[in-house]
């Protein structure tokens, strides 16, 4: 596990304690009991792919630990509208405050502005956060294999599905992938960024794709910058993408998405 991930996870444990002191778990559970159905994140991804289109998870991200502020002029609702117009299948919204300058409010703003399913992009390590995601209005959560033990993976994914949330399980190497496929969720993300060096190579996805069961949707994450990158993936039967920074640096994120994935149409 990388030093930055260790630091983030230690902070998450404190954050859960702080938040549960303000809003007790029992209250969250009660609030999660009578909510509208989620929008169907995995189903939307599968439908895009079945139609022959790339399934694009477009990320709403202000900053990152490695790059600092990526988009100073940051308006989640406007970004969400732009992404939907540009052809995104789903959204990913950063809610981590301390390391990514995210906010729960950003998720609400983005989701309220569009009809797309939304992933809560955060470091989920505790059942409290799963209930919290459902109450916030998320349609899907992220579980990072390198941050969790097998029992946690099973428990958190099981709870999410029980609450009607989809789960994107993220891996970085073959060992993590072997652990991820034990969890019965349809979405497996392969992050092309090395957690130790922060280097990005698309070869990570290409090397691992054959080990992903055919009944799962493989989502390639990080490093998709050019139409050639997209074509490389699609020619290798990788049809789902999570892209953030490339779009966040563009004046019009949705137009950047359209140019990257649909300009040939």
Curated annotation (Swiss-Prot):
Q: Which UniProt keywords apply?
A: Amino-acid biosynthesis, Aromatic amino acid biosynthesis, Decarboxylase, Lyase, Tryptophan biosynthesis
Any one Gene Ontology BP term = L-tryptophan biosynthetic process
* First and last residue of the signal peptide: none
Per the UniProt entry, the Enzyme Commission number(s) are 4.1.1.48
Q: GO terms for molecular function, please?
A: indole-3-glycerol-phosphate synthase activity; phosphoribosylanthranilate isomerase activity
Q: Which SUPFAM superfamilies match?
A: Ribulose-phoshate binding barrel
* Pathway where it operates: Amino-acid biosynthesis; L-tryptophan biosynthesis; L-tryptophan from chorismate: step 4/5
- Record's family? Belongs to the TrpC family.
**Which protein are we looking at?**
Indole-3-glycerol phosphate synthase
């Amino acid at each position: 596990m990388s030093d930055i991930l260790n630091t983030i996870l230690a902070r998450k444990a404190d954050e859960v304690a702080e938040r549960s002191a303000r809003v007790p778990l029992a209250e969250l559970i009660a609030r999660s009991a009578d909510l509208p159905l989620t929008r169907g994140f995995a189903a939307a991804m599968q439908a895009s792919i079945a139609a022959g289109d790339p399934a694009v998870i477009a990320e709403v991200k202000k900053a990152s630990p490695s790059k600092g502020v990526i988009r100073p002029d940051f308006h989640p609702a406007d970004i969400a509208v732009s992404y939907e117009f540009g052809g995104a299948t789903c959204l990913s919204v950063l809610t981590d405050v301390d390391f990514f300058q995210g906010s729960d409010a950003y998720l609400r703003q983005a989701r309220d502005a569009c009809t797309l399913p939304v992933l809560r992009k955060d470091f989920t390590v505790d059942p409290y956060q799963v209930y919290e995601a459902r109450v916030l209005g998320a349609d899907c959560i992220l579980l990072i294999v390198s941050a969790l033990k097998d029992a946690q993976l099973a428990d958190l994914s099981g709870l999410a599905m029980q609450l009607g949330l989809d789960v994107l399980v993220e891996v970085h190497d073959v060992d993590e992938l072997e652990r991820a496929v034990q969890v019965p969720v349809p979405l497996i993300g392969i992050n092309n960024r090395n957690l130790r060096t922060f280097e990005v190579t698309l070869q990570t996805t290409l090397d691992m794709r054959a080990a992903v069961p055919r009944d799962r949707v493989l989502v390639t994450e990080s490093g998709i910058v050019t139409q050639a990158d997209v074509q490389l993936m699609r020619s290798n039967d990788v049809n789902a993408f999570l892209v953030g920074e490339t779009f966040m640096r563009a004046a019009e994120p949705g137009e950047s998405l359209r140019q990257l994935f649909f300009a040939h149409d």
